C-alpha cells in the first residue's frame, strides 16, 4: 500500500503544477486580450 501511494504522490504533484500553469497561462491570455481592446 505504501508503494502505491509513493507512486501516486508525484503524479498528484505534477497534476497540481499543470493546473497551476494552465491557470497562469489563461490569466495572461485574458490580460493580453483586455489590453488589446
Swiss-Prot record:
**Which UniProt key words apply to this protein?**
Signal
Where on the tree of life does the source sit, at the highest rank?
Answer: Viruses
Can the keyword Signal be found in this entry's annotation?
yes
What residue stretch is flagged as signal peptide?
1-23
Family to which the UniProt record says this protein belongs: Belongs to the orthopoxviruses VACWR204.5 protein family.
> Which protein, by its recorded name, is this?
Uncharacterized protein VACWR204.5
- Originating species: Vaccinia virus (strain Western Reserve) (VACV)
* Organism lineage string: Viruses, Varidnaviria, Bamfordvirae, Nucleocytoviricota, Pokkesviricetes
